A protein has these predicted regions:
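Intrinsic, short, N-terminal disordered tails of RNA polymerase sigma-factor systems
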Residues: 1-16, 135-142, 162-165
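Arg/Lys-rich amphipathic alpha helix in sigma70-family domain 2
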Residues: 70-73, 84-105, 125
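A short pre-motif secondary-structure segment
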Residues: 146-150
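Sigma70-family region 2
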Residues: 22-23, 49, 60-77, 96-98
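DNA-recognition helix of helix-turn-helix
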Residues: 80, 91, 152, 158, ...
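Short, charged helix-capping/linker segments at alpha-helix termini
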Residues: 22-31, 41-60, 168
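Acidic, proline/glycine-rich intrinsically disordered inter-domain spacer in sigma factors
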Residues: 110-137
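Structural recognition of an alpha-helix C-terminal capping motif at a helix-to-coil junction
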Residues: 42, 56-63, 76-88
Length: 181
């Protein structure tokens, strides 16, 4: 019977899984993890630029989201709420690591990757994408992070300002300057 319950969870909408998680259903929690871990890892990796740290941030963020699920009010989608947790934790970890200066920024590979891992065949598209990636690696950290959040993750200026503790005007200016750089 448990196998049938577990399999049926795969077809359930996220809004049906949340109440099960709140009641401590481990299968529902695992299903949420399975649905979101790849995407959240990629979000974190784009910010922290280290696969081990991104893995840790993703797991800590998912655990945090599941333990604080009662605070989820449904004002945004669960995925957007979880993504915000991952972004905030990723930025926190990145800043913490930079303070300790554990990594030489010049040696860190920054790679933009689709959630499904698709790599285009077209050589020209790949060449342009590689040029964009190389250019973004050269940007100051605040420019790189704000551009990543805006262009890749799809956050608007207000959300980025909130995440990075900037006013709306300063956020727009920073992104504009980052694009010019």
């Amino acid at each position: 019977k448990q196998t049938n319950t577990f399999l049926s969870l795969e077809k359930r909408h996220i809004d049906d899984l949340i109440p099960l998680c709140l009641n401590g259903n481990r299968h529902a929690q695992l299903e949420i993890y399975n649905r979101y871990y790849k995407g959240m890892y990629n979000v974190s990796y784009r910010i922290v630029k280290d696969s081990t740290i991104a893995e840790d941030v993703m797991q800590e963020s998912l655990l945090s989201a599941l333990t604080k699920l009662d605070q989820f009010k449904g004002e945004v989608s669960f995925g957007a709420w979880l993504k915000r947790i991952v972004v905030n934790n990723s930025i926190h970890q990145y800043k913490k690591r930079m303070k300790r200066q554990e990594v030489d920024l010049g040696n860190v590979m920054y790679k933009v990757e689709d959630n499904d891992g698709y790599v285009p065949d077209n050589g020209m598209i790949e060449l342009k994408a590689q040029k964009v990636i190389e250019t973004m690696k050269l940007l100051k950290d605040n420019y790189r992070i704000s551009l990543t959040l805006h262009l890749i993750e799809g956050y608007d200026y207000e959300e980025i300002g909130e995440i990075m503790n900037l006013s709306y005007a300063n956020c727009r200016t920073m992104i504009s300057r980052a694009k010019e750089s």
